[in-house]
């Protein structure tokens, strides 16, 4: 006897820096719970983000921008990802970093526009008409070949369909006869035909014929209920960038050069403004007809100070365009020089005319108690066990250096405790890894003391 173990097909995901964030952690009235949904503290910032989520859901925020400003390690990216979690999968969320716009192949403004279009969804409602039932009659109607000769051509196909509620006789196009032959449809089969596309699907043999043969490989299906003619609404979610790409890549020809071109790695090309305008016209027509609905999503640009003056100017135009998403910026800079200039100093490295258009959410440094709670959350997410004094020591290290450094010490400390033959991470393990791995402040202090020993 052979016994096999069935392996799980559930996808295992890597534990990332923000795996523990599940939402904004707000109560029914929109007030922030101190520690909920993976977020700790930052009550004012989370409540402000909650108002933004409500505005996005009610479609009153499109074309506006938000800035998350605060020191490094204060949860700006975590709040942006929490907004994405609150909005759900149906609202497009496109994260990018400021330095992504710089490319040798395409312009900076093109990269920005691509991400803008990725952040705008289109929900298309399509009503599909389906004829479904058991085949009672299948008669191809032949006519003389109009091209002459002795052959005959099929002008149409008469097919009878039966359900539990009634019967219908249909006159179909000859192209559907080819599809019926491919599916090997016979009288007594249960099929459905899509009226819009002419697609035919054989579902199986009607179960009224189940007693015909002893040996049978057929799959028997019950007689369909309801009417023969049914209408079904199908909803598709696409982004405007998907439509741009689909129309920007025409299929190549059948000659050798075209086929060789398809085999080679295609170079990234820009999508023209003319094509985008044509797609916008079609989208607007669909919206006017009620076929489609525009879903403004969220574009999250981290490290916004990495953009230069040209891209900031382009952002003005993009934010004021009729089709624009909600844009969330994040930065950890104070007053600094705007990239692309030599002497223009501005708050957060953003031009003042763009800052004037933004709603700014401030994030504050965490207290020692908040840091301890965040470290506990991370340890729980990573499946690590720590003694209470180890948590206290880590929060002290986080206060003196950074929260990121304290969280990064968790995994090496777990390895150290395994080497020492324990399951729980102790304060001694934390001290050991703290002495082995330097943080940025201690490293820079060491560098300034031994500056003459390093190469210039």
UniProtKB/Swiss-Prot annotation:
GO terms for biological process: box C/D snoRNP assembly; cell division; chromatin remodeling; DNA recombination; DNA repair; DNA repair-dependent chromatin remodeling; mitotic spindle assembly; negative regulation of JNK cascade. Higher expression occurs in primordia of mesoderm, anterior and posterior midgut and cephalic furrow early in gastrulation, as well as in endoderm and mesoderm lineages during germ band extension. Later in development expression is only maintained in endoderm cells. Expressed in thoracic and abdominal segment neural precursors of all embryonic chordotonal organs. Coiled coil: none annotated. It is found in: Nucleus. Its EC number is 3.6.4.12. Disruption phenotype: Death at first larval instar. GO terms for cellular component: brahma complex; Ino80 complex; NuA4 histone acetyltransferase complex; nucleus; R2TP complex; Swr1 complex. It holds the Pfam family TIP49_C. ATP binds at residues 70-77. Keywords: Activator, ATP-binding, Cell cycle, Cell division, Chromatin regulator, DNA damage, DNA recombination, DNA repair, Helicase, Hydrolase, Nucleotide-binding, Nucleus, Transcription, Transcription regulation. It catalyses: ATP + H2O = ADP + phosphate + H(+). It is an enzyme of class 3 (hydrolase). Its main location: nucleus. One of its GO terms (molecular function) is transcription coactivator activity. Gene3D superfamilies: 1.10.8.60, P-loop containing nucleotide triphosphate hydrolases, RuvB-like helicase, domain II. It comes from the Eukaryota. PANTHER family: RUVB-RELATED REPTIN AND PONTIN. Forms homohexameric rings. May form a dodecamer with rept made of two stacked hexameric rings. Component of the chromatin remodeling Ino80 complex. Interacts with Myc and rept. Acts as a transcriptional coactivator in Wg signaling caused by altered arm signaling. Pont and rept interfere antagonistically with nuclear arm signaling function, and are required to enhance or reduce arm activity, respectively. Also an essential cofactor for the normal function of Myc; required for cellular proliferation and growth. Proposed core component of the chromatin remodeling Ino80 complex which is involved in transcriptional regulation, DNA replication and probably DNA repair. Belongs to the RuvB family. This is RuvB-like helicase 1. It comes from Drosophila melanogaster. The lineage of its organism: Eukaryota, Metazoa, Ecdysozoa, Arthropoda, Hexapoda. The gene is pont.
